[in-house]
Amino acid sequence: MNQFESSALRKLGLGLLIAGAGLGLTSQAGAAGHAAKSGTVQCLSECKPRLGIVSAFGAEADILLAQTKDKRDFRINGNRFTTGILRGNPVVIVLSGVSMINATMNTQQMLNHFRIERLIMSGIAGGVNPASHVGDVLVPERWSMPMEVYWNGDGSVPGPCGSAGDITCLGLKLATEGGKPRPDYKIPAPGGAGGAAGTVNSGLFMRDNFVMTAANSPQGEFRFDYEADPAMLAVARTLTPALGICGPKNPTLCVSTQPAIRVGGRGISGTAFMANPDYRTYVFDTLKAEAVDMETAAFAHVAYANHVPFIAFRSLSDLAGGNDFKDVGAFFGSGLAETNEASVTLAFLDAWKRSKHP
């Protein structure tokens, strides 16, 4: 064999290895490496209709997995997808990992490999509304990504395509309200006294997201919000689970206000972990956002693109930007947020089963 032939064979072998890695699936149950088909739905691993549950943190997923019966694990690109029965509902549960990219990747993997009738995001978040408290469980009606931005250097409304606010020649679209671009974030000026006089324009203007679906192809569409499923929201509004005030990991850490469940409003997600009270005030004043996390809006984008209804339950572990929050003693460590969130998710699954939705 000459050097050229040896090199060609190595490249061919590498190509086959990469192709195999892209298509391969390892299942602890042994059902791997083939595509199943049910009607028009293609499922690479299993085609039983299920609710798909995505969690970002292990503590959130573990509570749900502990109550899941008839569990069966599938390994997909190293991630564990667990099928089973949870509160009478056929489910598949995955730990997505933190971040917009991980949420996107693992939600799409779930939709590719299983027959998902509806999606549920289950997790914790930071509170944006100053009226919220640690341990509250929020169920927003819609989700958006305000950190998708056009960054204009001089702080003025961008207009690279001719008129102020027009960025369409770049394949982009500014987020608007009342026909006008939403205001950019004002950065506190060095040594400023606070208030509008103590800020400078950042030039960070919110953008709509571009999304392509089977229905809007080939032109696609721009969206700022992704709406949760009305039928799932209606069931969520009936829930009255008992929510704790002290964390199970440290019963001495208790919040001063009884946590509550609230359905409605807007949730937001972004690539940054928000620990900035000024930016929190900006997104509350501009968007009336209720909660912020790093996964749900990306998950919602994938759900919308695949025509799969969704809902998200987020329990507050802190007020984003946190040190000014009187309940900061309960921040993360007590386990209160994930326990309350799991209680609401489980109550929803009970109610969903009783509602006999398809």
Say what each PLM segment does.
Residues N2-G15:
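Bacterial N-terminal signal peptides that target proteins for export
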Residues K11-L12, A29, S315:
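Hydrophobic alpha-helical segments, especially transmembrane helices
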Residues L14-L16, G30, P358:
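Long, low-complexity, intrinsically disordered N-terminal extensions of eukaryotic proteins, enriched
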Residues G52-G58, L64:
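Mature N-terminal segment immediately following signal peptide/propeptide cleavage
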Residues Q67-K71:
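Short Gly/aromatic-enriched secondary-structure transition segments
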